[in-house]
Amino acid sequence: MSEPTSRRPAYARLLDRAVRILAVRDHSEQELRRKLSAPVMGKNGPEEIDATADDYERVIAWCHEHHYLDDERFVMRFIASRSRKGYGPARIRQELNQKGISRESTEKAMRECEIDWSEMAREQAVRKYGEPLPSNFSEKVKVQRFLLYRGYLMDNIQQIWRNFAD
């Protein structure tokens, strides 16, 4: 039988928790640090893990070493996931920034992802407003506002009507 969690060393408990978190989905390093430092719900309510900063660093290093934690992989999967849900590049960049991903890593991944953002914007507009897309000014403004909210760039949005006019 396993020993009670309170008797296990803090490093072992942190490592176990990190592996459990990363088994569900990829996380950025900053997300993992935040989740590891948050209190754990135990049988008697929230419990703190009495770990040192060195314990956290060792756990993060172990996760990198064993390929459980990889920010590049996380960024690529995050971009793919959010674009499938219909979000544009501006929104995805902002969300990655909130998750602690550097601007350089985000820009590199956005260049490598090979997503046609103009076509994605068109698909979202058609899904919301139907085919053919509105051509009068007030309806176009509604479509633009919707796509800007979804995180598409104005160039991508204007491309819809340029291609439509051809």
UniProtKB/Swiss-Prot annotation:
The keyword Cell membrane does not apply. InterPro entries: RecX_HTH_1st, RecX_HTH_2nd, RecX_HTH_3rd, Regulatory_RecX, WH-like_DNA-bd_sf. It comes from Salmonella typhimurium (strain LT2 / SGSC1412 / ATCC 700720). Keywords: Cytoplasm. GO terms for cellular component: cytoplasm. This is Regulatory protein RecX. Modulates RecA activity. It is found in: Cytoplasm. Belongs to the RecX family. The gene is recX. The keyword Glycoprotein does not apply. Gene3D superfamilies: Winged helix-like DNA-binding domain superfamily/Winged helix DNA-binding domain. One of its GO terms (biological process) is regulation of DNA repair.
